[in-house]
Amino acid sequence: TEITPAQASLIYANEADVLNVAMFGMTAKQWRDLNPEKKYNMRDYATVNELICLSNMENLNAVFIDQGMPQGERLVKLNQIAIQQMRVLEDDGDDRKYLK
């Protein structure tokens, strides 16, 4: 049996919220409730580094789903990855060595 468009939409929104919670600590609805004055969705207000991290997490989430990892486990793992990646992306680079 094929899923209906409504079911597909719900599944997609649910997976999007896994990424939202891992990255921002809240679902899209929670963010909208906290920011009723904002015109766009939470990702539209994300920084470039947050968007880079989200893109990476979307790819990793697909791999984790393919591996059969349960959603709760994926959420924890993605949150740990988001924290680590944001540390790297936000690093000012003062202690890095360059290839020059």
Label each PLM-derived region with a short phrase:
Residues 1-100:
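Positively charged, phosphate-engaging catalytic surfaces used for nucleic-acid and nucleotide handling
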